[in-house]
Amino acid sequence: IGPSTTLNFYVLAQSLRHLLRVGDEIVVTNQDHEANIGCWRRLSEHGIVIREWRVGKADGELDLNDLDALITDKTRIVCATLCSNIVGTHNDMAEIVEMAHRVGALVVADGVSYAPHVIPDVKTLGVDFYAYSTYKTFGTHQGVLWGSSEAMKKTEAQGHFFNEEKSRYRLNPTGPQHAQIAALAGITEYFDQLHQHHFGESALSLHQRARQTFDLVGEHEAKLANILLDYLKDREGIRILGQDHAVPGERASTIAFHARAMPSNHIAEQLSHSKIGVGAGDFYALRCVEALGMDPADGVVRVSMVHYNTAAEVTKLVETIDSILPGK
C-alpha cells in the first residue's frame, strides 16, 4: 500500500529494471492513464525498447491483433489497463495475459478505473501485478499494488535492506501511512452493508458477498450508462469515446464525449450551475486524447456514474446537456 497508484507503478518499474537488458522490449498502450506509461517509458534511458500498443482513431479502443503484432521474443513486460478512464471499454485482460505469457513476459495491469465497477479475481485473470486506487472504491487516497508470489520474487527490493524478505515492505520505500491505511477497513464495511441492504443476512463468505453486490452494481450502472449513451449517440455533433451501448462486464459507466459545438470545460461549467458534477480535460490520458485527434487543452467531458446514482439524476443530466448545447 502506497500513497498513490502512480507512485506504486514507478517503484515497481524500478524494481524490475534489473531484469532488463539493452534491446529488451516493454509494451505500453497510449490508452492508459499516464501512471502506467511514463514510468516504463523512462526505462528507455537504459536501452530498453518501448513499443506502443495504439488505440483505434475512431473510438479509442485497443485491438488484440495489434498487440499480437507487437509482442516478440524480446518482450519482457506488457502494461495495459483493464478499463481506460476515458474510453470506458473493458479490455480482455485474460487474453492479454495469455499472449504475454506465451513469450514469458510479465503483465502489469492497471485496475484503477475498473475497481469501482467490477471486483477482480486476479488469479483468474492471471496478471502478474495488479494496481488500483482505494479512493476509487470509496475509501482514502491510497494506492494498492498486488503481485503474485512468483512475480514478487522477481522484483528487487526498494525498501530498507533489513525488510527485503518481508513482502509487504518489499516495494514500499517509505513508511506506511497508518491512519489512512486503518481507514481502509471502512471500504469492506461499506460494501458489506450494501449487500445486507439488498440481500439481507447471508452465510456467504465476504468475497462471495462482494461478488454478489458487484453483480447488482454492474446491472444498475449499465442502465444508467445507457440513458446517457442513447441520448449522446442520437445527438448531432457528439463524439462518444468507446462503446455506445453499455453491457455489464463490457463497458464501465464512465462516459466521455466531445461536443463539436462547445468546449468541454464550458459544458462542465454550465452543468455545475445546475448542481451537476462532471469533469472536463484529458484526465491524465493525454496520449489517448491526442491519438483521437482531439486538442488536449479542450479534452473531453467525462461523466462518472456509480452505484449510488439514480436514473432520475441521469435524466436530469441529459435534459440539461440538451438545453446547453446549441441546435438539435
Model-derived segments and spans:
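Pyridoxal 5′-phosphate
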Residues: I1-K328
